[in-house]
Amino acid sequence: MQLIPSLITQLSPWRLVRLALAAAGLPGLLSAQKIAATAANPPTPAEVVELNPFIVDASRDTGYVAAETLSGTRLKTEVRHVASPVTILTEEFLQDIGATSFADIVEFMPGTETYRFDDSDLRGEQAHNGRTFSARGFRADNQSRDFFNTGIPLDTYNTGPISLNRGPNSNLFGIGSAGGALTFGSRPGRLDRATQDLELKFDSNGSQRYVYRRNQPIVPQKLTLSFAALQEQRNGFRRPEGNDRTSVTLGAEWRPVRHTTIGLNHERGELKNLRPYQFATYDWTAPWIAAGRQLTTPVPGSSADFTPPNSASVPRAIESLGNSSFIRILGTDYPIFEYNRSFGYGRRTYLNGVLERVSVADSRLLPLETYTGGFGQVNRTSFDTTMVRVQQRLLPGLHAELAARRENTDGRDHGMLGSNEQAVYIDPNPILANGQPNPFVGQPYIESATNRVTLSEDNNEAWRFSAVYDLALPDYRIFGRRLGRVRLSAFYSEEESASFMRRLTQRVRSGGGNLRHRLYLGGQNGWYLPDGLKRDYRQVRGGVGVPSVDTVWEEGTAAGDRDARGNKTNALSFVGHALLLDERLSLIAGYREDENTSETFDPGAESRKVAKNGAMTYGAVLHLSNWLSLFGNYGENFRPAGTGRVGIDAKHLPENLGQSRDFGLRFALFERKLFGSFTYYDTKQLNQVRNSLGEIINDFDDVWDTIEYAYSTLSPATLAAARLPASPPTRPTDDATAIYSRNSAENNGNPGAIFADTLDSRSKGIELELIANPTPNWRLSWSVSQHRSTVTAARKTVMRYYAEHLPTWQRYVDPAGTIVAPLSTVFIQADMRGLRLADMLAAIANGFDETNAEIGGQRYGNREWSSNLVTRYTFREGGLKGWNVGGSARWRDKALVGYAANPATGFRNPSRPFFERGYWTMDVFVGHSRKIFRNSVTWDSNLRVRDLNHPKVWTSVAAAVDDGFTGNAYPTRRVLMASTSVELSTSFRW
């Protein structure tokens, strides 16, 4: 059994494809006498599609209703026979929502929404990659093209069918999110006719989009070539914000003989994304104004910190810079200034001195849509990808496919602003660093952080072999119905990737410090950093007539500044699909086994890990009648934890597992003009990675240090008198606390960044979908979704560590919680806090109690209910013939943003949640279609108004409680809702 896989793994995917292409000619040699007859009477496209289980026939779709899908078993299956929850977006539906990219699609599917943040990504960094969304309350970033994982964002200019699978499904993807996955195929070529189309789109944000496609048969019904090109400049509603893309796709479809299909697809392109942080800009000017506009007393050349006033009558409103900073003042001729610690800046906003980041910049100070990072937050990615597939009917009922894909990307990420630094500051310094009077004293400004460039390279190769056999069961009858048929399939795949990253920081050569860029607001400066920062430069000029300041790009040496990763996954799966009793009963079952090997070559976390997992998916559909069906499905998948982070015990984290149970019914009413489904689901995600452990590592490290310090000062006699061991307990040498102590200096004081923990969560709810074609002219789609996402377990690895070592620590604390006499002067933390060991353990236990108090409560950001409506009506006769009107509406329930505190414990109380109001938005469009140039060209035009009812408003996605004072909730994160925009598109097809 090991012989074939071992031989296969010795071949590269491209050698396999070359062998397959050579083998593709074999049927032609064996069937030479049949070729002439085939050429004389070529099969129709419908006949060929029906014989090929790897391709669906989109021509069978009606309006928004899809007839076939690959997203049940990876093979062509009628949608009504699929047991797992799947939504298929037809071409008409995509046109009516005006979708061209992933971002346009995600808000229109049931149970999904735009991703904001989650427990392992509090800053929302993953929202920028163009493929992350939230499904059933879980973060999902699985996108596959032709069932190969891809990191290139979806665009409809070169894609075919698009499907959303909700919940885990190992038949489709063994490695992925519990929320589901988005799958799409390459746009197929046509062998029967030549086609061309040209699309143009513009909007009121200044966006432009141009698409040209051509399909040209070279040998009718045998060979066709296709070409597609995209040029897009897509601006967002924030300023500045944009996603630009230039792509070219070449394709070929070759059918040398009737039962052989060879396909080739190659895409090359470049992405440029200017990605604002999604959260509102904070206001750090209000406290300074409220406190009486305090000023610093800076001393140029001094190394002393500025000590701000702070008393009951004089609130603290300014802070020392803390470190020497090189600052370039944009829009002036000033040289680069080196500000020392005696200079200051306006303090962050605090509510009652407790809550931070509760105030956003007033629109009069900074327009709402302005992004303070300006053009300094740009990502450029060049990519190329090639996919080859050979599909062959070997024998009647037996088909095989061999496919390979290669994808390479090179990225350059320019970052100048952290999400916590997205703020409007105030300048309280009466003089400049050169001692001259400061003309900007008392003025607000925005400032970039360290200028950094991250260079990355990702190379991915994958191949798979698929075999499927359709078996007709004996012609027995049960309950008067034929037994039916069975489809058996097997898939073997390998995927190997290598990624490299290094981070460069721009520093001033002479002083070695980081260079920051400051822009004072108002006047002629505009509102954000100027166009000059679009460029990467090695010298920063101070202004006209001022000598340049020499800078150098330094490569970081800390953990996370350099990284090389390797990843390889082998997967073998078997799927069976039985259609029984005259297709009244559909049974699907599959098992998949993945072996994932990941390696990390990082200065802070070099390691190798092998993860193996078996997952199954099985389900059934019972057609009670021609209009009513019942279905049930169970699915699993997993995601390797990888080597980038480890638990507090310095061991690899457990694998992330997904499990889901789905039950429901489907119906087709009114002569199949109304289709619908109702689903109840219960989805779990186990061992989700959450944030770093810096704080808890500190706490545990303090406990070990305190005990070790005490033993270093006590005599054997004292220990014996206290009935304590003669030597201290052995601290694990390879756990996080030991590594923290050893590597703190090596990792910029934050080795905790490589340590993480896990949590479990669960989402339960319902999904209702209705799709109708009431008349040949009217299309309608409506969905309602509910999900209640809760945390079921948290801090799992830390709690195990705590339970293991707590008995040892408690030996040094008596039952009353005081320090063991006579050691009360020794078992005290050897730092400025001077905490007793008992106090430390009590604080740790209190933190765990607070975590446990939240278990069972809804997760932050959860919007329990949502609904989507899309409709279009086309006039086919009369004076309005050729016109169409339609629109869409999306409603989102209130969002959970925090919890009130329990007065008795001070912990957050899940029974007292705080919510942000819900919202709804609406799009409308009017279109026209007509034939021109003697009916040889179809001309379509469309005018769309997006977010018709949306002014520029913030909505809160997180809040904190002012526990010690009012007990009220105050927003700590706000997201700006998209404002109204107008879009004009036109297309020509011939």
Each language-model region and where it sits:
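N-terminal Sec signal peptide and the immediately downstream disordered periplasmic leader
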Residues: 2-111
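Extracytoplasmic beta-strand/coil segments of soluble accessory domains associated
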Residues: 66-79, 83-87, 97-153, 160
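Outer-membrane beta-barrel transmembrane strands
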Residues: 138, 149, 246, 313-339, ...
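Outer-membrane beta-barrel translocator/receptor signature
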Residues: 158-160, 171-248, 256-260, 384, ...
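Surface-exposed extracellular loop regions of Gram-negative outer-membrane beta-barrel proteins
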Residues: 272, 280, 494-501, 518-544, ...
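Flexible glycine-rich, low-complexity coil/linker segments exposed to the extracellular/periplasmic environment
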Residues: 290-369, 426-451, 500-565, 695-756, ...
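C-terminal beta-barrel architecture of Gram-negative outer-membrane proteins
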Residues: 640-644, 819, 827-828, 859-934, ...
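C-terminal beta-signal and adjacent terminal beta-strands/loops
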Residues: 684-687, 788-789, 888-902, 928-990
